[in-house]
């Protein structure tokens, strides 16, 4: 694999020159690969792959049919290089990515424009925008339920 990376790097230097190669490295996000090994693996895996599509969030979807193991030949490169998780993949691309369908997300949107009822939003659990469920009796619940099940007897005053 290292030989493939070195060959493609030398080929890119020959085609674009050293300045163009350095510009490509910066634009494609290879500098961000230094602290993030997952991104580096994705970038190396992208060599020889075809870009299948880009979703509305900027995520790029790739496919490599040659010498790649089945089940590992479709992947996503997230738009956010520093903060990413699987919930950033919209529903229309999820089916293609997990081999449920061979239609890409763009094809699914053209086949059925209103396929999914809600607009996709990533999961913000554990972050500032997270929806936090509070039970009925929780003090932070705005509609806190009064759990008093009885009313104490108050004698009537006679005059």
Swiss-Prot record:
Keyword Metal-binding appears in the UniProt entry: no
Record bears the keyword Membrane: yes
A GO CC term attached to the entry: mitochondrion
Keywords noted in UniProt: Electron transport, Membrane, Mitochondrion, Mitochondrion inner membrane, Respiratory chain, Transport
Membrane topology value: Peripheral membrane protein
InterPro entries with a match to the protein in the record: NDUFA12
Subcellular localization, as worded in the UniProt entry: Mitochondrion inner membrane
Pfam families: NDUFA12
One annotated GO molecular function: cobalt ion binding
Function summary: Accessory subunit of the mitochondrial membrane respiratory chain NADH dehydrogenase (Complex I), that is believed not to be involved in catalysis. Complex I functions in the transfer of electrons from NADH to the respiratory chain. The immediate electron acceptor for the enzyme is believed to be ubiquinone.
Subunit structure: Complex I is composed of at least 49 different subunits.
Similarity comment: family membership: Belongs to the complex I NDUFA12 subunit family.
Protein's UniProt name: Probable NADH dehydrogenase [ubiquinone] 1 alpha subcomplex subunit 12
């Amino acid at each position: 694999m290292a030989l493939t990376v070195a060959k493609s790097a030398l080929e890119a230097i020959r085609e674009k020159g050293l300045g163009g190669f350095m510009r490509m490295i910066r634009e494609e996000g290879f500098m961000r690969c230094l602290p993030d090994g997952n991104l580096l693996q994705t970038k190396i895996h992208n060599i020889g792959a075809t870009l299948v599509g880009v979703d509305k969030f900027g995520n790029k979807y790739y496919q490599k049919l040659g010498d790649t193991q089945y089940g590992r030949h479709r992947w996503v490169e997230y738009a956010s290089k520093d903060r990413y998780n699987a919930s950033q993949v919209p529903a229309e691309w999820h089916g293609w990515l997990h081999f449920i369908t061979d239609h890409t997300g763009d094809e699914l949107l053209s086949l059925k424009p209103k396929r999914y009822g809600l607009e996709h939003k990533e999961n913000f659990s554990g972050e500032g925008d997270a929806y936090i469920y509070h039970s009925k009796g929780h003090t932070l619940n705005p509609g806190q339920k009064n759990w008093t099940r009885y009313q104490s007897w108050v004698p009537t005053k006679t005059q």
